């Protein structure tokens, strides 16, 4: 059993491994104040060959017993995930998913359970920290670490990981994920703030993200795990060249179509034509061809935004879509409004 701890935001943050879920590829107990979460990660030994995406499942659950409650009424067991649990699962998924090596298609699970809640220290941000650390100390190839913090602002002062009662009084609340070098995800809400205040809040968050990552590395160094080799990039230069030759300048023509449905139809028509043209030379490689086409579209769209400052529907980067608001859309339903 290995423990490391450090004071973060006026409370003790503790990481522990080797005591619970020892059969998992990686597991860690994260304690902050008196809030305790368990994160366990596992991965299949063999990759999926029938898919062209990474099958990652992140599941976050807040057990009733964590708050000292027993489910009452007719249903005595835990119900399906709540909206908050689903959103926290996504909040954890977003910063960790891009850090898996390209081509890694082994089914991977990240299971996060809140074991104890003190009612004040929010467990959601520690789900991402625990997932990062559990992946680090597992044999699963992953290019972390990352850390997540919550930043609040009360009376002009920034607060790291504000308590549940403090959040109600915050003018700004951000959840920020990042690595040693940069910020990779931001989510939050605020009253109207200046750009300077938002930038300062992100700098404040990143400073403490680095501090948490240092503690993650301390535990990682103590565990000394041997990682599985990263999968070799399955690059078929001949196939890429063939697809690229079929695409030509057609991509730019399609992404310049302003009507969304027309653009989608043109894209699907192009895909069908390329698959038909290449099916003899590259049989049973439909997934690979589709993946190459999607990558080419993504690259072209990003290039158009960065070089021309224009999106696919013609809007500039500082413009928003037109919106039509129809109040009292339903005559007998209170507060019904249609936004289109």
Which residues make up each language-model segment?
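Extended amphipathic alpha-helical scaffolds
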Residues: 1-44, 52, 232-340
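Mobile "lid/hinge" segments at catalytic clefts and subdomain interfaces of large enzymes
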Residues: 139-258
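Flexible, glycine/charged-enriched surface loops at secondary-structure junctions
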Residues: 102-108, 143-145, 212-230, 261-262, ...
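A generic local secondary-structure boundary/capping motif
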Residues: 3-4, 16-19, 27-28, 45-47, ...
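Alpha/propeptide regions of enzymes that mature by internal proteolysis
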Residues: 1-2, 8-11, 25, 53, ...
């Amino acid at each position: 059993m290995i423990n490391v701890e450090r004071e973060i935001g006026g409370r003790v943050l503790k990481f522990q491994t080797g005591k619970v879920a020892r059969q998992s590829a990686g597991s860690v107990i994260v304690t902050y104040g008196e809030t305790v979460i368990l994160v366990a990660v596992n991965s299949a030994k063999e990759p999926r060959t029938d898919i062209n995406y990474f099958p990652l499942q992140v599941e976050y659950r807040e057990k009733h017993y964590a708050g000292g409650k027993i489910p009452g009424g007719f249903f005595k067991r835990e119900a399906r995930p709540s909206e908050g649990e689903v959103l926290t699962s996504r909040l954890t998924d977003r910063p960790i998913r891009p850090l898996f090596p390209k081509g890694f298609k082994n089914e991977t699970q990240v299971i996060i359970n809140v074991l104890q809640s003190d009612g004040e220290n929010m467990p959601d941000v520690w789900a991402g920290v625990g997932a990062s650390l559990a992946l680090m100390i597992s044999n699963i190839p992953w290019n972390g670490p990352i850390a997540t913090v919550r930043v609040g602002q009360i009376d002009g002062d920034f607060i790291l990981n504000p308590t549940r009662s403090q959040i109600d009084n915050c003018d700004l609340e951000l959840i920020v994920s990042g690595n040693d070098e940069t910020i990779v995800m931001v989510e939050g809400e605020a009253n109207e703030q200046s750009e300077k205040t938002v930038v300062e809040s992100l700098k404040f968050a990143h400073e403490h993200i680095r501090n948490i990552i240092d503690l993650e590395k301390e535990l990682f160094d103590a565990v000394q795990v041997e990682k599985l080799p990263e999968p070799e990039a399955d690059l078929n230069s001949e196939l890429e060249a063939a697809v690229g030759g079929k695409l030509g300048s057609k991509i730019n023509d399609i992404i310049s179509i302003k009507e969304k449905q027309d653009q989608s139809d043109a894209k699907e028509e192009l895909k069908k034509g390329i698959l038909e043209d290449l099916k003899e030379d590259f049989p049973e490689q439909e997934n690979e061809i589709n993946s190459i086409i999607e990558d080419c579209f993504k690259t072209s769209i990003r290039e158009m935004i960065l070089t021309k400052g224009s999106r696919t529907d013609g809007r500039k980067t500082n413009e928003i879509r037109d919106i039509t608001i129809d109040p009292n859309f339903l005559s007998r339903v209170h507060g019904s409004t249609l936004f289109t």
